[in-house]
């Protein structure tokens, strides 16, 4: 199993269908379990996906329309029931604090887990852990809505043959990293001569929105982009009036953002068959998948290497 993968727990929008639950998305990032927009029934979806809810340690709510948050309370209660020892970090728009509290304390139960709230009022870097950072930007929806980007830093990868040919080893390598150049054997060796930069992996989560610059910025050069595509082009008027996107619009955003992989989700219940979503989007952006519940999407290999 990939250490970095996106698992679809639900892909419907406001109304579930017989085959699609309200949206919920689990992103596994090495040892982290990041749960995005847990809609109604998310706890049960974990069972069908054969995934332990205890793997979750961060929960993100883009906005407080029901299909993006009604599963929050039950997930917190389940984690409480399972007596998880790790803290549960919750990220959400600060303007929705009262709704977060209602979901968290909507029933009688004795909370013993540590829930750490991160109400977000400012756009930009929310947290930077060194190994990865969380970024939030406001999208263009009917209510205060956040899109997310998870990014790891770029890393220096050395070329062993180049190091060996120049006699560079041991502590000298640390000097080279620090100073970007060293003098050895009567010549100057630059860091770029013996290494390349591997671009850090990244994923963008684009929830309910009209096409907007913030969505493009979040997905810019990302490895993967999970994006709402509630409607097909034939119902574009509905997308515009409800502040959503069509599959074609989502694909156009992906193309402009130069993401590697687009995954469409958040489908209106009016569509029983989703084949046309793929046809519409792939005509604009070839590397596209239509979200399927319980399916895992491993991260594509990052080809962005500066040698």
UniProtKB/Swiss-Prot annotation:
GO terms for molecular function: 3'-tRNA processing endoribonuclease activity; zinc ion binding. Zn(2+) 2 binds at residues 67-68, 208, 266. The active site is at 67 (proton acceptor). It catalyses: Endonucleolytic cleavage of RNA, removing extra 3' nucleotides from tRNA precursor, generating 3' termini of tRNAs. A 3'-hydroxy group is left at the tRNA terminus and a 5'-phosphoryl group is left at the trailer molecule. Coiled coil: none annotated. The keyword tRNA processing applies. SUPFAM superfamilies: Metallo-hydrolase/oxidoreductase (SSF56281). Keywords: Endonuclease, Hydrolase, Metal-binding, Nuclease, tRNA processing, Zinc. Zn(2+) 1 binds at residues 63, 65, 141, 208. Its cofactor is Zn(2+). InterPro entries: Metallo-B-lactamas, RibonucZ/Hydroxyglut_hydro, RNase_Z/BN. It holds the Pfam family Lactamase_B. Binds 2 Zn(2+) ions. Its EC number is 3.1.26.11. It comes from the Bacteria. It is an enzyme of class 3 (hydrolase). Homodimer. Zinc phosphodiesterase, which displays some tRNA 3'-processing endonuclease activity. Probably involved in tRNA maturation, by removing a 3'-trailer from precursor tRNA. Belongs to the RNase Z family. This is Ribonuclease Z.
């Amino acid at each position: 199993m990939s250490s970095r993968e996106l698992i679809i727990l639900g892909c419907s929008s406001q109304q579930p269908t017989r085959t699609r639950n309200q949206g919920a998305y689990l992103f596994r990032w090495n040892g982290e379990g990041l749960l995005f927009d847990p809609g109604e029934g998310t706890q049960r979806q974990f069972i069908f996906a054969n995934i332990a809810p205890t793997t979750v340690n961060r929960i993100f709510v883009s906005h407080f329309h029901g299909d993006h948050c009604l599963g929050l309370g039950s997930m917190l209660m389940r984690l409480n029931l399972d007596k998880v020892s790790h803290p549960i970090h919750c990220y959400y728009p600060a303007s929705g604090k009262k709704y977060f509290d209602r979901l968290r304390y909507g029933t009688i139960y004795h909370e013993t887990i540590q829930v750490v709230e991160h109400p977000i009022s400012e756009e930009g870097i929310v947290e930077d852990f060194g190994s990865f950072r969380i970024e939030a930007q406001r999208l263009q929806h009917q209510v205060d809505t956040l899109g997310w980007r998870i990014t790891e830093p770029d890393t220096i990868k050395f070329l062993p043959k180049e190091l060996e040919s120049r006699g560079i080893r041991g502590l000298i390598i640390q000097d080279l990293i620090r100073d970007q150049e060293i003098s050895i054997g009567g010549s100057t060796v630059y860091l770029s001569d013996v290494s390349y930069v591997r671009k850090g992996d990244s994923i963008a989560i684009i929830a309910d929105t009209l096409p907007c610059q913030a969505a493009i910025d979040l997905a810019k050069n990302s490895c993967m982009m999970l994006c709402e595509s509630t409607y097909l082009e034939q119902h574009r008027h509905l997308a515009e009036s409800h502040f959503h996107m069509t599959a074609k619009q989502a694909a156009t955003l992906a193309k402009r953002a130069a993401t590697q992989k687009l995954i469409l989700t958040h489908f209106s219940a009016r569509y029983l068959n989703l084949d046309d979503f793929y046809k519409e989007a792939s005509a604009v952006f070839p590397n596209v998948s239509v979200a399927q519940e319980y399916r895992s999407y491993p991260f594509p290999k990052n080809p962005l290497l500066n040698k």
